[in-house]
Structure formats: C-alpha cells, structure tokens
Amino acid sequence: MTVIICVDNNGGILFNGKRQSKDRIFRKYLLDIVEKKNSRIAMSPYTYSQFKEDERKELTDVKEEFSFDEDYIFLERAIPILWEKVNNLILCCWNRDYPADEYFNLPIGVECILQKTEEIVSDSHTLTIETYEVHTKNWYRKSKE
C-alpha cells in the first residue's frame, strides 16, 4: 500500500482542523499515478471535497475509515497508520511555511528510504514530490524477570 501525505516545510499537515493548501496540478498528478497502475485511491469525504466532479470519480473510493488494504490512501489528517502494511510513502512538499497545529511524524521503528524526487510546477509555486520505500522494524520489549 502507498500512503500519500502533503506537508509544509516543518512537517505541518493541518491548521485549525483545515488543510494548509491544495493544488489542482497535484490532484491530477495523483490521479494519473493511480490510473497508470490501474488502481484506485482511498480518501476521506473531507479530502474528496477538493476534487471536482470531472476529476475521474472512477479512480476514487471515499471512506470514513480505512482498512489499510487499499492500494493508495491520500491522508490529510493525522490518523493511526498500520505502517506494517505500508510499502511506499509519497510526500507532497508544499515548499512553504504555513501555520500548523497538526504534524506528520514517523513512529519509532519505521524507516523511509528516498527512492525518487520530482518537481511539479503548479499554478502558484513548485511542489516537491518525494517517494519513499517504507520498512518497519519489529521492536520487542523484554519483560523484567
């Protein structure tokens, strides 16, 4: 599974419960990836609200909750992620400093290895798309005897 998250320069994802930014060119980029893989992208109703009617509904699954069995999940809110099911992470870097009160953080035991970096020129500025391969480590806590 691939998780997609948009972040600002400080790892911020939300401010006052709302997305920091949105971009038409990035949405097209995402839908093109999913279409090329003959797949679908899962997202919350909140995330789906930024997609227009003509933006290929057949490629999207709108869900309140995720099973993490989906091929792609576009997340805009900090939710618990089953990292052991994640193979790839796509970070859309806004390359801007925005106000934020929720941040994207990797938990201990999750390692991301950068595979590819792309630049997308949007209507207002250039976005950096970073694709990572995700590895999880099993951490075992030994009980005191």
Predicted features, each with a name:
Residues M1-E145:
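Enzymes that bind and transform nitrogen-containing heteroaromatic metabolites
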